[in-house]
Each structure stands twice: as structure tokens, then as C-alpha cells.
């Protein structure tokens, strides 16, 4: 079993028996009902994440990726700075189970937060503020930045480096690709616009035809209605004529029977 396996096993055992630790259970209960503890824990997590990203930026060789990470760090710093007043309001609220000394310590923690947030490296020209004075020896930590004896940049600083050249080329390539994509989108929109215009013109041409069809349908409906009325009248006339003929035939039969009976009885 390796050392890592042993440490993992010990950690799992410690977590298993944490529920029997009275102090930890008390802290967990306090933080569960304490908005300050939750928010301050979120601050700590975001600050640690930002510091880790800042450390990754120093090791990042891709200039574009480093710029993107620095921008994300600056957004995180701005968001944290906006949330500091809320944390200050929560720090002065009394919480059950906390002493006066602990409340004072919370206020001190909140007062130290702006400096901690500002100290996070974000790739800006000024960088994090420092209380120490600038000396010529302070430039040794950044050998790629050189200062004159008067504190001004020398000519070597403004020369284009390989990283800046690569970043410029990558930026130009992405800009060209973006312009090509926008051109394709513009062409597609123009094609859709032309199709819509053609469809509109075709609909305009179809409107008179539809009106004419509606007129003809109305006329045919009226003619069919009149034809039905005339046909009904004709049928009624035929029925009346047929009934008259049947009545005459029946009358003749009745008269014949009467004449026969008269002759027989006579």
C-alpha cells in the first residue's frame, strides 16, 4: 500500500467519525443558520479559485488564453467587490452561539477582504497595489520589463516579441475567420430576403386569381341554387300530372265495375 492510499484511507476514516466531533457539529449548525458564514465561505472559495487561475496565467504560454483568464479574474474581482457591502451588513448582525469577540473578528475579516481582492493578480498594467516603494531592484522579478534610471520604459520594451507577434497573428486569423462567418451569414440573409421578396410578388400575382376563383365559385353556387329550384318545380308538376292520370284510370275502373253490376242485377 502506497503513502497516497494510506492518506486516503485515513481521511475517509476521519470523515466517517466527524459526526461524533461535538465542536465540528456545533460549527456546522452555526454556519447552516448563519448567512455571513455561508457568504464568507463563498468569498474564500472564489478568492482561492482566482489565485489558482492567476498562478496558471503565469505558466500559460498561449497569450490569448492568458488574456481570457485575466479577464475572467477581473470579472470575479469586480463581482466580489460588489458583494463586500452585503458581507459588512451581515457581519454586524448577531447570531445565536457567537460571542462578542467572534463578531469583532468577523468585522476585521470583512475589512481585510478589499485588500485581499485587490491583491489578486489580474494582468493589468498597474497590477496589485503595494505599500512598498519602487526601487531599481524591484524590476528583477520581471526580467522581461526594463525601466530607465528615470523610471521610464526604454526602447527594448516597445520591440515586438515572439509572443506578441504570435498573439497578433492569431488575432488576425480569428478576425478573418469571424469576418468570413459574418459574410456567410450576410449572404444567407440576402438569399432569404430575395426568397421572401419573390414569394411576396408571387402572392401578389395570385391574389387576383384567387378573387376571380371566388367570384366564379359564387356564380356557380347561385346557378346551382336556381337550377335546384327549377328542378323542384318540375318534379312537383310531374307528380301532379301523374296523380291526375291515376285518378282518371281509377275512375274508369270504378265506372266499369258499376256498369257490370248494373247489367248483372238487371
Curated annotation (Swiss-Prot):
<dbReference type="InterPro" id="IPR006012">
    <property type="entry name" value="Syntaxin/epimorphin_CS"/>
</dbReference>
<feature type="modified residue" description="Phosphoserine">
    <location>
        <position position="12"/>
    </location>
</feature>
<feature type="domain" description="t-SNARE coiled-coil homology">
    <location>
        <begin position="172"/>
        <end position="234"/>
    </location>
</feature>
<keyword id="KW-0813">Transport</keyword>
<dbReference type="InterPro" id="IPR000727">
    <property type="entry name" value="T_SNARE_dom"/>
</dbReference>
<feature type="transmembrane region" description="Helical; Anchor for type IV membrane protein">
    <location>
        <begin position="244"/>
        <end position="264"/>
    </location>
</feature>
<dbReference type="GO" id="GO:0005484">
    <property type="term" value="F:SNAP receptor activity"/>
</dbReference>
<comment type="function">
    <text>Vesicle trafficking protein that functions in the secretory pathway.</text>
</comment>
<dbReference type="InterPro" id="IPR045242">
    <property type="entry name" value="Syntaxin"/>
</dbReference>
<keyword id="KW-0812">Transmembrane</keyword>
<comment type="subunit">
    <text>Part of the t-SNARE complex.</text>
</comment>
<keyword id="KW-0472">Membrane</keyword>
<dbReference type="GO" id="GO:0006886">
    <property type="term" value="P:intracellular protein transport"/>
</dbReference>
<keyword id="KW-0653">Protein transport</keyword>
<feature type="topological domain" description="Vesicular">
    <location>
        <begin position="265"/>
        <end position="266"/>
    </location>
</feature>
<feature type="topological domain" description="Cytoplasmic">
    <location>
        <begin position="1"/>
        <end position="243"/>
    </location>
</feature>
<dbReference type="GO" id="GO:0005829">
    <property type="term" value="C:cytosol"/>
</dbReference>
<feature type="compositionally biased region" description="Low complexity">
    <location>
        <begin position="130"/>
        <end position="141"/>
    </location>
</feature>
<feature type="coiled-coil region">
    <location>
        <begin position="44"/>
        <end position="87"/>
    </location>
</feature>
<dbReference type="GO" id="GO:0005886">
    <property type="term" value="C:plasma membrane"/>
</dbReference>
<keyword id="KW-1133">Transmembrane helix</keyword>
<keyword id="KW-0597">Phosphoprotein</keyword>
<keyword id="KW-0175">Coiled coil</keyword>
<dbReference type="GO" id="GO:0005783">
    <property type="term" value="C:endoplasmic reticulum"/>
</dbReference>
<dbReference type="GO" id="GO:0009506">
    <property type="term" value="C:plasmodesma"/>
</dbReference>
<dbReference type="GO" id="GO:0006612">
    <property type="term" value="P:protein targeting to membrane"/>
</dbReference>
<protein>
    <recommendedName>
        <fullName>Syntaxin-71</fullName>
    </recommendedName>
</protein>
<feature type="region of interest" description="Disordered">
    <location>
        <begin position="122"/>
        <end position="146"/>
    </location>
</feature>
<dbReference type="Pfam" id="PF05739">
    <property type="entry name" value="SNARE"/>
</dbReference>
<comment type="similarity">
    <text>Belongs to the syntaxin family.</text>
</comment>
Amino acid at each position: 500500500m502506497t503513502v497516497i492510499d494510506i492518506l486516503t484511507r485515513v481521511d475517509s476514516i476521519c470523515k466517517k467519525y466527524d459526526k461524533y466531533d461535538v465542536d465540528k457539529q456545533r460549527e456546522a449548525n452555526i454556519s447552516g443558520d448563519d448567512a455571513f458564514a455561508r457568504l464568507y465561505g463563498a468569498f474564500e472559495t472564489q478568492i482561492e479559485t482566482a489565485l489558482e487561475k492567476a498562478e496558471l496565467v503565469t505558466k500559460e504560454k498561449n497569450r490569448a488564453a492568458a488574456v481570457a483568464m485575466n479577464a475572467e479574474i477581473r470579472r470575479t474581482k469586480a463581482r466580489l467587490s460588489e458583494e463586500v457591502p452585503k458581507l459588512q451588513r451581515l457581519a454586524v448582525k448577531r447570531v445565536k452561539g457567537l460571542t462578542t469577540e467572534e463578531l469583532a473578528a468577523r468585522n476585521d475579516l470583512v475589512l481585510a477582504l478589499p485588500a485581499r481582492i485587490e491583491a489578486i493578480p489580474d494582468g493589468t498594467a498597474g497590477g496589485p497595489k503595494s505599500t512598498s516603494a519602487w526601487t531599481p531592484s524591484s524590476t528583477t522579478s520581471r526580467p522581461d520589463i526594463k525601466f530607465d534610471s528615470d523610471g521610464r520604459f526604454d526602447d527594448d520594451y516597445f520591440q515586438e516579441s515572439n509572443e506578441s507577434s504570435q498573439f497578433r497573428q492569431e488575432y488576425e486569423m480569428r478576425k478573418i475567420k469571424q469576418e468570413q462567418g459574418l459574410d456567410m451569414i450576410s449572404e444567407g440573409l440576402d438569399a432569404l430576403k430575395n426568397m421572401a421578396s419573390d414569394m411576396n410578388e408571387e402572392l401578389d400575382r395570385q391574389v387576383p386569381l384567387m378573387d376571380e376563383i371566388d367570384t366564379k365559385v359564387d356564380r356557380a353556387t347561385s346557378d346551382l341554387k336556381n337550377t335546384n329550384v327549377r328542378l323542384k318545380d318540375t318534379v312537383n308538376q310531374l307528380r301532379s300530372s301523374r296523380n291526375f292520370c291515376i285518378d282518371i284510370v281509377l275512375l274508369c275502373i270504378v265506372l266499369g265495375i258499376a256498369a257490370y253490376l248494373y247489367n248483372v242485377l238487371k
